[in-house]
């Protein structure tokens, strides 16, 4: 090796010659014929978007329905309990109506029952339970159950002339219909 090769290193490395690549011109699609793959991709994208929008709408509807169900569950949670208390309320009212007499013991019993009834009504009102006492009102089949019909007499036809049993509503939902007698035309 020569001194020059040692100091400068080996001679310049041979550079590869640039290759000439013959490029074929890209064939353009004839005018008026869209690319089939592009059309398929657009169609798939459209279908996916449609599915996405439908899924979003379905989720929104489900969310609304669940919110409504939860609200109703809170609102009407007392329904079974209230239905069980209605006969107790009826019995208390009948007991008060039957407690006639001037004896001091009867008067005390009546007074206690009236106070209890007042407390019952207060609690019912507090929890959204309303009484349906339709005497003299127009017959409403959504809130009243006709037990009999009587000749109208002085009452207008199709009005309630007698109430056998009061009805009750829980937050405007019927707990029990009022049992009534309706004036006949």
Curated annotation (Swiss-Prot):
CDD domains found in the cross-reference section: GrpE
GO biological process: protein folding
Gene name of this polypeptide: grpE
InterPro entries: GrpE (IPR000740), GrpE_coiled_coil (IPR013805), GrpE_head (IPR009012)
UniProt keyword list: Chaperone, Cytoplasm, Stress response
Name of the protein in its database record: Protein GrpE
Organism annotation: Methylococcus capsulatus (strain ATCC 33009 / NCIMB 11132 / Bath)
Cytoplasm found in the keyword field: yes
PROSITE patterns, alphabetized: GRPE (PS01071)
Function per UniProt: Participates actively in the response to hyperosmotic and heat shock by preventing the aggregation of stress-denatured proteins, in association with DnaK and GrpE. It is the nucleotide exchange factor for DnaK and may function as a thermosensor. Unfolded proteins bind initially to DnaJ; upon interaction with the DnaJ-bound protein, DnaK hydrolyzes its bound ATP, resulting in the formation of a stable complex. GrpE releases ADP from DnaK; ATP binding to DnaK triggers the release of the substrate protein, thus completing the reaction cycle.
Lineage, top ranks: Bacteria, Pseudomonadati, Pseudomonadota, Gammaproteobacteria, Methylococcales
């Amino acid at each position: 090796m020569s001194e020059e090769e040692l100091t400068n290193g080996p001679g310049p490395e041979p550079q590869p010659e640039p290759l000439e690549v013959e490029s074929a011109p890209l064939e353009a699609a004839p005018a008026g014929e869209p690319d089939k793959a592009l059309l398929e991709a657009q169609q798939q994208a459209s279908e996916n978007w449609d599915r996405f929008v439908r899924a979003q709408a379905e989720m929104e509807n489900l969310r609304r329905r669940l919110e409504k169900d939860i609200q109703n569950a809170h609102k009407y949670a007392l329904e079974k309990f209230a239905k069980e208390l209605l006969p107790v309320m009826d019995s208390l009212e009948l007991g008060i109506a039957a407690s006639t007499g001037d004896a001091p013991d009867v008067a005390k019993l009546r007074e206690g029952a009236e106070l209890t009834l007042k407390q019952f009504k207060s609690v019912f009102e507090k929890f959204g339970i309303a009484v349906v006492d339709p005497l003299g009102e127009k017959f409403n089949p959504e809130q009243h159950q006709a037990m009999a019909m009587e000749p109208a007499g002085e009452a207008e036809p199709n009005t309630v002339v007698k109430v056998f049993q009061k009805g009750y509503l829980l937050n405007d939902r019927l707990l029990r219909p009022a049992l009534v007698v309706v004036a006949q035309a």
